[in-house]
């Protein structure tokens, strides 16, 4: 009688553990782009004032962020070049 109960408990633990790992993976895959986007936005916003920094940081910006910041951020002396 103990064997079927033990089997059920082991299977239940495996299912719960697998579900938790799946949830953790989904949470991480959802959070990583948000964290990266936050860094990109911060970097791009900083570049509004400094053209040299823009040149270095625009490589980190996603295409959509780059388009948005090209419209918003114009260096004091020259136009921000289009992304390659």
Swiss-Prot record:
PROSITE patterns linked to this entry: INSULIN
Compartment(s): Secreted
Propeptide: 23-37
Presence of keyword DNA repair: no
Disulfide-bond pairs as recorded: 43-48, 44-73, 57-61
UniProt keyword Transcription, yes or no: no
Signal peptide: 1-22
Keywords: Carbohydrate metabolism, Disulfide bond, Glucose metabolism, Hormone, Secreted, Signal
Coiled-coil region(s): none
Superkingdom of this protein's organism: Eukaryota
UniProt main location, coarse: secreted
Similarity comment text for this entry: Belongs to the insulin family.
UniProt function note: Insulin decreases blood glucose concentration. May have evolved to activate insulin receptors (INSR) in vertebrates. Molecular docking studies reveals unique interaction with the human insulin receptor. In vivo, insulin-like peptide injection reduces blood glucose levels in two models of zebrafish diabetes (streptozotocin- and glucose-induced). Also shorter swimming distance of zebrafish larvae, an effect which is not observed with human insulin.
Name of the molecule in the record: Insulin-like peptide 05
Organism whose genome encodes this protein: Exaiptasia diaphana
């Amino acid at each position: 009688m103990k064997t079927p109960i033990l089997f059920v408990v082991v299977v239940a633990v495996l299912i719960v553990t697998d579900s938790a790992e799946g949830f953790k993976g989904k949470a991480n895959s959802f959070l990583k782009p948000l964290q990266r986007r936050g860094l990109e936005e911060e970097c791009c916003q900083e570049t509004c004032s400094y053209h040299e920094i823009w040149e270095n940081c625009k490589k980190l910006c996603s295409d959509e962020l780059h388009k948005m910041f090209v419209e918003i951020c114009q260096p004091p002396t020259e136009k921000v070049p289009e992304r390659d």
